[in-house]
């Protein structure tokens, strides 16, 4: 192998190692057997969420994972491997790939890294069932609104009771 080829591969290992370190999640799949149309559709769905799907040689993946501190991943780098890297949403790759794998049995999820932690297939499936970040924030805001609204109704009820009862209600409230 020429020095130029070795340098190119070393640079690729560095790039992939950096992606593993900096990504919110990296999910490894085996996309063997997908048609060109299916592969294009999968890449399109991932790209809409800002996720990059790269087919990478296992030797490069192995070295990059070791360099990034994820040597435990080396067991899943068998057969053709593609990695979906997301820098923003840790759950989106799991959700999209799981949904696509359910519809296309040829796509096999192998595992990955989510928020710096090694994730096996079961973990990826759990992450896939979580709502998106925006969905979770929406649920949190709904809870805040409910709590504030309930407090406002309680204050209003006390005020109404005080207005109805006059001094007797004030004395009862002070006694409590």
Curated annotation (Swiss-Prot):
It holds the Pfam family Ribosomal_L10. Transmembrane segments: none annotated. Keywords: Ribonucleoprotein, Ribosomal protein, RNA-binding, rRNA-binding. GO terms for molecular function: large ribosomal subunit rRNA binding. It comes from the Bacteria. CDD domains: Ribosomal_L10. One of its GO terms (cellular component) is ribosome. GO terms for biological process: translation. InterPro entries: Ribosomal_uL10, Ribosomal_uL10-like_sf, Ribosomal_uL10_bac, Ribosomal_uL10_bac_type. Forms part of the ribosomal stalk, playing a central role in the interaction of the ribosome with GTP-bound translation factors. NCBIfam families: PRK00099.1-1 (NF000955). Part of the ribosomal stalk of the 50S ribosomal subunit. The N-terminus interacts with L11 and the large rRNA to form the base of the stalk. The C-terminus forms an elongated spine to which L12 dimers bind in a sequential fashion forming a multimeric L10(L12)X complex. Belongs to the universal ribosomal protein uL10 family. This is Large ribosomal subunit protein uL10. It comes from Leuconostoc citreum (strain KM20).
């Amino acid at each position: 192998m020429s020095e130029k080829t070795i340098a190119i591969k070393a640079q690729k290992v560095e790039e992939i190692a950096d992606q593993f370190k900096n990504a919110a999640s990296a999910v490894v799949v085996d996309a063997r057997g997908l048609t060109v149309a299916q592969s294009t559709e999968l890449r399109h769905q991932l790209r809409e969420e800002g996720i990059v799907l790269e087919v990478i040689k296992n030797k490069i993946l192995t070295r990059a994972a070791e360099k990034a501190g994820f040597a435990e991943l080396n067991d899943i780098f068998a057969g053709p491997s593609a990695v979906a890297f997301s820098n923003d949403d840790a759950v989106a790759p799991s959700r999209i790939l799981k949904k696509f794998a359910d519809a296309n049995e040829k796509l096999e999820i192998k595992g990955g890294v989510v928020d710096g932690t090694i994730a096996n297939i079961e973990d990826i499936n759990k992450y896939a069932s979580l709502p998106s970040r925006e969905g979770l924030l929406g649920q949190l805001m709904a809870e805040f609104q409910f709590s504030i609204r309930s407090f406002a109704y309680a204050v209003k009820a006390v005020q109404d009771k005080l207005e109805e009862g006059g001094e007797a209600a004030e004395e009862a409230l002070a006694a409590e």
